[in-house]
Amino acid sequence: MLKRLKEKSNDEIVQNTINKRINFIFGVIVFIFAVLVLRLGYLQIAQGSHYKQIIKNDENITVNESVPRGRILDRNGKVLVDNASKMAITYTRGRKTTQSEMLDTAEKLSKLIKMDTKKITERDKKDFWIQLHPKKAKAMMTKEQAMLADGSIKQDQYDKQLLSKIGKSQLDELSSKDLQVLAIFREMNAGTVLDPQMIKNEDVSEKEYAAVSQQLSKLPGVNTSMDWDRKYPYGDTLRGIFGDVSTPAEGIPKELTEHYLSKGYSRNDRVGKSYLEYQYEDVLRGKKKEMKYTTDKSGKVTSSEVLNPGARGQDLKLTIDIDLQKEVEALLDKQIKKLRSQGAKDMDNAMMVVQNPKNGDILALSGKQINKSGKMTDYDIGTFTSQFAVGSSVKGGTLLAGYQNKAIKVGETMVDEPLHFQGGLTKRSYFNKNGHVTINDKQALMHSSNVYMFKTALKLAGDPYYSGMALPSDISSPAQKLRRGLNQVGLGVKTGIDLPNETRGQIEPLTNNPGNYLDLSIGQYDTYTPLQLSQYVSTIANDGYRIQPHIGLTIHESTNKDEVGPLKKKINGTVLNKVNNTEKEIKQIQEGFKMAFNDKDGTGYVSFKDTVVPTAGKTGTAEVFQNGEPRVNSTYIGYAPIDDPKLAFSIVYTNQPVPPPWLTGGDLGRDVINYYFKQLGKDDKNKDKDK
């Protein structure tokens, strides 16, 4: 009896222990479920919208697509740069698209279009051979696979050795059909996920376009669309000034990557690379087309929707008058041939800039480079990117600097005579090599007196000329004063034109070479651009106000039609500075320029005496060397009409013969003035008829 009671008591103890453990386990389970319920509630209530957005993003992705750029027009609305539409085949890679799936699509597409295989590299072929023959590639690398497995070599070393083992025999296995597939496949791989990549946009035939369009449902990621190229209705005219746009394959050029990525561009965006296309990129670029792509769980694109059709870029109207531009080019071409026939066989550059002196509008600019045989190539950009010694054209600036620093007075007379310095150095004027002629400042400009400028420079240095004198030893301070005066009219400083790569010329230090200081005063030391010369003479014509030149005129909203859209912005030429001279001093320079072109003793009289409107200006000749042989640069600057200037110009011819024959380079300026004002008169008459 006691034994049974004892056994029963032990059973109860065991049962109680089991019950307690079961209760503990149930408690833990209940606690875990409670935590899970709370966590689930938190996810659904507090974080529900967040995860819904993630799911949504996985399913719907917005992608921007390129649109055509804005047009470039001349000041009268004539289209200079436009867009030419062309058919294109594109590919958009899905988020989870595999290489084998892309290859399958490429194989299907290769049966519908013909690709140019010239861009395929040897490395492309090797990679593709591995893609097509993975087992053969593996069999070539038995030893290396073991080394890769035990860590003896790294993956990049393995890959490098594999590529080195693939030779001509393997690459010869690739058929012409394989190369067609490869040409497509390499373009597919060039793009990023959900970023449309151009497969073919050159010479897409209507047959190809239609065939692909009909098979789109069987070609995942492939689409047919329209691409564009820039077209130039006036051919090569101003082609260099317009600049270039990158191709779809090129995207953002490497040297401009940081510049454009910082502005939110994508790497495969087509962008302006140079000159106007680059300068006005923000204006000419369009508003991208926005597409929404829907993907399934595997990441494949199942549908697309246009969220925003986008718009082509805004139109840019230029200050250029294309009719005047064409005339300047034709006259420059004619003048070059004429000068060569007169003996200028080594002339290698000829350039002209035409502008409105009062508002900075560039009306025309043309440059030509000439080789030994006389063949000419366009070099319009040279008008502001290349610099030359320009000679006596700068003398108006020298006199203004002399007035500013009280070195000379308006109307002051000096004797033009050979200057003899200590050490045997002699300097003289071209028009008066041995005589003694008393002239004033206006006459100095008319005759282009070197001596008057030398004496002005010496007075500026505090050392008036006397025969046998030693030149000043330290001319750093007077050189700075002289250059400051030249800078004020636009010589030796950038003009500020709205184009990249402008040069300010070559401005070398001047400290202990007084001979160079004297040469500076007559345009024989520092070098300047044709555009700087144009700004300089415009400053004289504009009563001392230096205006920033500009080639952009107005910006207009784009429209779906051919006409120019509503005005969005006017581009004005701002006043950069006014020369630090009195009205009387400026008038004196203007009078000297008038005499240079209209007095029978003036250096420009032969060419400019009979222009249809009175013209003022200055000529220049700079001594230079070409391949060690002495040559001269010839320059001409001017403006018209004298009383109310509407046009200013500069002309530069480089490396003409020495001693110079009588060359009629100034005739180009005369012919342009006559054309412009005759045409202006016709336009005014037509306007009167329309009233």
List PLM regions with ranges.
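Solvent-exposed, polar/charged alpha-helical surfaces in well-ordered, non-transmembrane soluble domains
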Residues: 100-111, 210, 214, 239, ...
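N-terminal leader/targeting segments and the immediately adjacent pre-domain N-terminus
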Residues: 212, 276-289, 293, 301-338, ...
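Short, small/polar residue-rich loop motifs at catalytic or cofactor-binding pockets
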Residues: 64-68, 288, 345-349
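Beta-lactam-recognizing serine transpeptidase/beta-lactamase-like catalytic domain environment
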Residues: 81-82, 294-309, 320, 324, ...
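Solvent-exposed, acidic/flexible segments
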Residues: 65-66, 98-103, 201-209, 231-234, ...
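Short, basic/aromatic recognition patches
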Residues: 52-64, 324-344
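Active/ligand-binding-proximal structured segments within catalytic/core domains
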Residues: 391-400
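Membrane-proximal periplasmic segments of bacterial cell-envelope enzymes
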Residues: 1-282, 291-301, 457, 480-484
